[in-house]
């Protein structure tokens, strides 16, 4: 056990985690040069296309130093804020972490968030300054930043270039000499934490575990403590990006895959504890938090008969991504669909894209919302994720909305833009700190609802892409909120309702109906598009009717003849207007998302 090192790589997006992982894998010879591809740890197509890591991946590396053979378990983590729970999960199973910082960009908001998770887990952190081959690289400035913001001693920081391979050997030596070996006891009852699980079409549900004490062998009967179920171990493997390597036992300190031949991944939930059924543990491994969805949106199939296909697709996707929650819902406008909970906006995009790609579905997504708490006049508390669940106005005492604590790091020249943006989004400043003469760290409390739409894009565009942003949920606060409904031809379209602050309702309503007017196709009758709060109409636009020239067949002659025809047409239009139905195109639902 003294020759095992468990470590993960933490970094902000685009600071070169996956490339560094590639170099370490190559240096240790875990994958032959012929099989090597760039970002080998990113297995999903979406990951490679977007250049992001979504699922944490593991690999077991062998490395010899001073005549001794060492086993290095590398766990690659995502960098994006939506997937930070993947990070906390990965770090819970390590003794050390490589903090990778781009030598030209410096410390970013995400870097700080991930470091705090690592420090809470008492990990040994090795600062790694990456991309030193870039012309704009300034390792000395970056070391100062790490010391100033995070307070880590950077005298032993290692400078590498993952692209060219400079400094990789020194890094491997540092991992072995500075990260402590796992401490566990093989003679104690078996204690293993499931820190990832996924579904394999041939082997069933697989659990990736970190063994703390004892050991697990093939054919053992094990107990999954969360479910209380017993299973036989069919196979054990070490993770490897090309093909896992089989083994007979996993003992204390090791990381490996347990094959139990289960049909359902919910039997091996992430964060659960595995122990031997003949000599079980008294207490499961603690300190592990489940991922809670923050953002909710309705997903509906465009072809209504594909509802069951969507249910199957969500069931299968949940096997690999336990953080999704979903329940069926119906909408007058869109038919049958699901209310799906996500970790954040990027997660929502990725899930929708995976459903459309991997399961060949066409979906409509409604505007994302957060969970509100409603206190009714009769004292009852409700939690709602869908604006249409809001009780009537006279029954509401107050509405509470979730707030987040946001950390933003930006070049100081954009400070004015950012403060304006945050004030428009009802942000409350709690801290402002100059890291260096030209970079500022801001902390704000912001309603979650204000960042769930397009905040990230607006932040990037108002700072030319230089600002970085991270958030964590904080608390619920009373808000001055109302429900804004949209009526088309007198019918309320439930899928377009949103909850907004009263101060913004008027402008939001006006923008809403303007955008809708451009999209609703012209009918043979006039269509009124209205925005309302309760029974009060606050904005209206009219889509003019298409005219048919009924007087074309009259040549000259009496004006009363023409008037009679026009009156008759008017009557007909009135009747049509009373019973006419308007079909809304898909863009109508998307336009709601675009309104600022």
Swiss-Prot record:
InterPro entries reported in the protein's UniProt record: EF-4 (IPR006297), EFG_III/V (IPR035647), EFG_V-like (IPR000640), EFTu-like_2 (IPR004161), G_TR_CS (IPR031157), LepA_C_sf (IPR038363), LepA_CTD (IPR013842), LepA_IV (IPR035654)
Domain tr-type G, residue spans: 2-183
Subcellular location: Cell inner membrane
UniProt key word Cell membrane: yes
Membrane-topology annotation of the record: Peripheral membrane protein
GO biological process: positive regulation of translation
Keyword terms: Cell inner membrane, Cell membrane, GTP-binding, Hydrolase, Membrane, Nucleotide-binding, Protein biosynthesis
Binding site for GTP: 14-19, 130-133
One function term, GO molecular function aspect: ribosome binding
Enzymatic reactions: GTP + H2O = GDP + phosphate + H(+)
Enzyme nomenclature, EC number: 3.6.5.n1
Keyword Aminoacyl-tRNA synthetase carried by entry: no
Organism domain of life: Bacteria
GO cellular component: plasma membrane
Family affiliation: Belongs to the TRAFAC class translation factor GTPase superfamily. Classic translation factor GTPase family. LepA subfamily.
Biological role stated in the UniProt entry: Required for accurate and efficient protein synthesis under certain stress conditions. May act as a fidelity factor of the translation reaction, by catalyzing a one-codon backward translocation of tRNAs on improperly translocated ribosomes. Back-translocation proceeds from a post-translocation (POST) complex to a pre-translocation (PRE) complex, thus giving elongation factor G a second chance to translocate the tRNAs correctly. Binds to ribosomes in a GTP-dependent manner.
Name of the molecule in the record: Elongation factor 4
Organism: Campylobacter concisus (strain 13826)
